[in-house]
């Protein structure tokens, strides 16, 4: 199967993210286009979506999965990102390296288990290597078992667990993947990428 991926510029991509997140009931708070723009402005970033035809109407193509990632710097001024860097200090080396943070993403329920998230992640890795990144970081919740399993299959390593004392399922799990050309050799998805402006 060939996966069709669309890579967006900042403003159009932010609108697309606001739209697709409406399909994710498991996200308690959806990202707005303004929030995405504020987070990504003035930093290297990537917004990608996988598209597929509807099974009952193959002429209609819809977004089924997405990923948004951005550069994470040692000296962040954004309070949330500065807090993230602080939490990872001693675990991740930021000095003299480019680190990509896989911020948000997901696959619509009816499309899960079909390789869309793998294809987006592999495209993210190829883009990251092309743009000089050394490592990809991501964060998930302990209760998101299928996401943790997918990240394991994609060879992300757990680098930190931040326990939640009230409910272990809400504990934060930080994962990392160091990048090198050998990462591309392990890619399995066939992808075509369209750049939208």
For every predicted segment, state its role.
Residues 107, 113-126:
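Conserved acetyl-CoA-binding loop-helix of GNAT-fold acetyltransferases
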Residues 57-104, 165-166:
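Conserved acyl-donor/pantetheine-binding loop and adjacent beta-alpha core of acyl/acetyltransferases
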Residues 1-64:
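Short amphipathic alpha-helix that is part of the acyltransferase structural core
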Residues 99, 128-141:
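Conserved GNAT acetyl-CoA-binding A-motif
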Residues 163-197:
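C-terminal "cap" of GNAT-fold acetyltransferases
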Residues 105-107, 140:
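Hydrophobic adenine-recognition pocket in adenosine-nucleotide-binding enzymes
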Residues 118, 130, 142-161, 168:
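Conserved active-site alpha-helix within GNAT-family acetyltransferase domains
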């Amino acid at each position: 199967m060939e996966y069709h991926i669309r890579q967006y510029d900042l403003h159009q991509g932010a609108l697309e993210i606001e739209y697709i997140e409406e399909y994710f009931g498991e996200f308690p708070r959806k990202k707005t286009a303004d929030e995405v723009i504020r987070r990504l402005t003035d930093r290297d970033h990537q917004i990608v979506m996988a598209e597929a035809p509807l099974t009952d109407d193959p002429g209609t193509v819809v977004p089924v999965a997405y990923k948004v990632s951005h550069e994470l710097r040692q000296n962040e001024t954004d309070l949330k990102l500065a807090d993230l860097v602080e939490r990872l200090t001693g675990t991740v080396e930021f000095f003299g390296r480019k680190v990509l943070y896989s911020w948000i993403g997901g696959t619509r329920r009816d499309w899960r288990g079909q390789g869309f998230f793998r294809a987006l992640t592999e495209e993210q890795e190829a883009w990251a290597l092309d743009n000089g990144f050394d490592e990809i970081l991501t964060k998930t919740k302990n209760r998101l078992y299928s996401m943790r399993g997918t990240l394991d299959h994609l060879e992300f390593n757990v680098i930190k667990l931040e326990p939640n004392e009230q409910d272990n399922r809400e504990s934060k799990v930080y994962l990392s993947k160091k990048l090198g050309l050998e990462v591309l050799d392990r890619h399995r998805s066939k992808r075509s990428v369209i750049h939208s402006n």
